[in-house]
A protein has these predicted regions:
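Short acidic, Pro/Gly- and aromatic-enriched capping/linker segments at domain boundaries
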Residues: 1-7
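Short, surface-exposed, charged amphipathic helix/loop patches that serve as local interaction elements
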Residues: 7-11, 15-86
Length: 86
């Protein structure tokens, strides 16, 4: 199990086998052509409960909107944190 915390304070855990997934690599490869596909990464990493928690973590308190910038930053932090550990 890989556990960590993003710069914004979101605590996560990912089962290691989820990172050794060819289909995840395919989605990550497509990000170069279409950065908005980052949304497709989440189901490969997290279950529904953790996805919901990440969205709530990035929900703007005033507007109620889940910020794309916050979600993107947290997802990138998760990959950077994992890369640093390997």
């Amino acid at each position: 199990m890989i556990e960590g915390k993003t710069k914004s304070g979101f605590e996560y855990s990912i089962e290691e086998f989820k990172l050794d997934n060819w289909e995840l690599l395919e989605v990550l490869n497509e990000l170069g052509d279409s950065p908005n596909k980052i949304v497709s990464v989440l189901p490969y990493l997290f279950d529904e409960e953790q996805i919901k928690a990440l969205k709530e973590h990035n929900r703007d308190k005033k507007t109620g909107v889940v910020t794309a910038s916050g979600m993107t930053a947290d997802i990138m932090d998760i990959f950077k944190n994992n890369k640093a550990k390997n």
